[in-house]
Amino acid sequence: MGAVTFWSAGRGARFDDMAEMTPRERVVTVLNHQEPDRVPLDIGGGGATSIVVEGYERLKRALGISSETRMMNKVFRVAFLDESVMQRLGSDCRLVTAKPSSRLAPKDLDENTFTDVWGVMWRKAYYGDGCHYWDLAKSPLAEATVEDLDRYPWPDPSDLSRIKGLAEEAKALHDNTNYAFVGDGGFKSFWELAWTMRGLEQMLTDLVVNLEFVTALLDKLLEINIAATGPFLDAVGRYIQVFRTGDDLATQTGLLMSAKTYRTLLKPVYKKYLDFVRSKTDARIFYHSCGNITDLVDDLVEIGITIVNPVQVSALGDTAALKVRFGQRVTFWGGIDTQHVLPHGSVADVEAEVRQRISDLGPSGGYVAGAVHNIQPDVPPENILALADAVRKYGTYPLTV
């Protein structure tokens, strides 16, 4: 491989490839499509790469850790992982995120219902073993007109309580640790937030019969996102290596809208947003979309996205073919099957899954290993540990898998 040039936020340095790299060096090396000492791992470095609360609490019990669990996202019930857990897993990434507003918070209507800061109502939905998620119960813009958008009580993107003290915290983390940092400004969704506020069926109908409303709503969300993201990146942009954004654009079988519709409506919005982001930070752009988005990857690259997550293998299929087709232009982040192997497979099955994804996606860098989306409550602790241990076992460069 030879010596590698390491770039982080515009600063270059060289290091000997025979030495063990720091997590930050390791991640940035694969983002440069070069081979580090080993494949980096992300578990807990973001809102789509963590563990759902019940599964996380079982993992902590298995590890003998009794700390209080902190919730990252109420709807998806994702946990902030303790530092001790992340060190045991060997995660190379840490999250730098905006804080909850001190002026505006979700409102509990009763023990089973709440409204979020956008005015969307959610209702508790139980499933096995007493676990629950929150299902969309009411969309506040379901019957709105374009004129109504101007009168709607939007969250205030200039609310600086969301970043109070964040610059100092991010600098301390950057200077005193060697992890790769993923920035998440909190407001970063367009399509998902739009249809959540409008209702999915109505929004899909609007794509055909009411483009004026769709355009007006997306423009409003762009305005809010830019206004909120600016202060966040002013605070942390120099310290992060990755900036996370995303929208679920597909199901397991195909896109939620035609590629033409995406290119006409959403792509220009994202281009404006990401142009703004890149004016504030040198961090690489991480884009999360579940489902089969193969037909849009070229479009994502065109607007500056260089990281694709979660690499939903149950939808995308042959990961070796994905690497051949897109691997020179994007870094794949995720890829370990959360839908079938992690919940239902044995430790040996998990190890085989990790080995396969590293074999397919790891050559020449461009791969950060991790689960496909958040690890769910039905994944046994031994399989989470098997995932982490297998990445270290099989991920050493030069790869031999």
Model regions and ranges:
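Active-site loop segments of alpha/beta catalytic cores
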Residues: 2, 7, 15-60, 65-69, ...
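Segments that shape or occlude catalytic/ligand-binding pockets
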Residues: 52-97
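Generic hydrophobic, aliphatic-rich segments that mediate packing or membrane embedding
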Residues: 78-85, 110, 114, 162-169
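Glycine-rich nucleotide phosphate-binding loop and flanking beta-alpha elements
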Residues: 93, 101-103, 315, 375
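Short acidic, Pro/Gly- and aromatic-enriched capping/linker segments at domain boundaries
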Residues: 98-113
